[in-house]
Regions:
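Acidic, histidine-bearing metal-coordination/catalytic regions of metal-dependent phosphoesterases
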Residues: 1-23
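Core catalytic region of metal-dependent phosphoesterases/phosphodiesterases
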Residues: 15-22, 27, 32-145
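Active-site-proximal loop/helix segment associated with metal-binding centers of metalloenzymes
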Residues: 155-209
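Structural motif
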Residues: 23-24, 60-62, 153-155, 221, ...
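Active-site glycine-centered loops adjacent to acidic/histidine catalytic or metal-binding residues
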Residues: 29, 67, 105, 159, ...
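Extended, basic/helix-rich recognition subdomains
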Residues: 190-261
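Active-site-proximal beta-strand elements of phosphoester/diester hydrolases
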Residues: 23-31, 154-161, 240-244
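Binuclear metal-dependent phosphoesterase catalytic core
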Residues: 148, 238-296
Length: 296
């Protein structure tokens, strides 16, 4: 019998064991760009960098669940590095500490290809872009991960575009349209890309529903991204978690696991009474014990 796409991906995904002493942060859909009108992260870059620094300083393992880099609209990863060198340097520190796992989504699926490897191998290692080479040249880029919590609960981590037909089965066509059509229409004429779940509430709900159905059918919790809609269910609800994105107006969302508990986090800019702007970390969901989640 032919396996469904999520079951197939899960069956070949590496399994990582962790316990209540481990701390994990999930972030997806950063869409790091080239600093032009095509760069969706730019307005929230300082918020994202603050979150990333927090996770590094506090010994979290950082799992990026796809669409970290906007490689549909931007052809060359070096152009993204030149816009965000400090972010890449911090990701490299996570890697050197063995605290970095990177998955690909539809917008950076090229990272899992030989074409991307050749792009990295061609980087002049005498230049500053050496950080890009050091980050990517031997970094596994996964389609999925399985996190095993003390043999009590397994979490399947995946971007989520696999259940979104136009962004998975028709990825070359979708990436062409986004790079050469929608990026122009959005940047110059203000049109909204209706093919993306991130921009279409109808498509977002369809993707959420498909992922929830798979979770229930397979008795397997999922942590995903893709839809840009964060969610942390109650323990008596279907355990489909979504870390949201980094490109909502003035905010970034993430999911944290600490001391065996899972939480949904919002990072946003707040103004203090003295007029100083600061980035605030706010728990907006949970914390809930992982072991309390049941399939209904």
């Amino acid at each position: 019998m032919k396996k469904d796409i999520l079951t197939r991906v899960m069956s070949k995904s590496p399994e990582i064991y962790f316990n209540k002493d481990n701390k994990i942060a999930f972030i997806s859909d950063c869409h790091r760009g080239d600093g032009t009108y095509k760069d969706d992260l730019m307005p929230n870059a300082n918020i994202y960098m603050t979150a990333l620094n927090y996770y590094y300083r506090n010994n979290f393992t950082y799992i990026e669940i796809g669409d970290g880099d906007e490689l549909w609209k931007v052809k060359n990863i070096e152009d993204i590095y030149n816009t965000y060198p400090d972010i890449f340097k911090l990701l490299l520190k996570f890697k050197y500490d063995n605290r970095l796992y990177m998955l690909y989504g539809n917008h950076d699926e090229i990272k899992a290809t030989k074409k991307f490897k050749h792009m990295i191998d061609r980087i002049d290692r005498n230049e500053e872009e050496n950080d890009v080479y050091n980050l990517f040249h031997d970094l596994p880029i996964y389609e999925g991960l399985v996190l095993n919590y003390e043999d009590l609960k397994r979490l399947f981590v995946i971007h989520g575009h696999q259940v979104d037909k136009i962004n998975y089965n028709l990825e070359p066509f979708a990436s062409f349209i986004v790079r050469y059509v929608w990026s122009f229409l959005e940047g110059h004429l203000g049109f909204k890309n209706g093919t993306s779940p991130a921009r279409s509430n109808t498509k977002r709900k369809k993707v959420d529903k498909k992922l929830q159905q798979w979770v229930k059918l397979n008795n397997q919790p999922i942590v995903a991204g893709h839809t840009h809609r964060s969610r942390l269910p109650q323990p008596d609800e279907i355990p489909y978690f979504n870390d949201g994105c980094c490109i909502h107006p003035y905010s970034v969302s993430s999911i944290e696991i600490e001391k065996g508990k899972i939480s949904l986090i919002k990072w946003s800019i707040k103004s203090l009474e003295n007029g100083v702007l600061t980035v605030r970390r706010e728990i907006i969901g949970g914390p809930e014990l992982l072991v309390n989640y049941k399939i209904i």
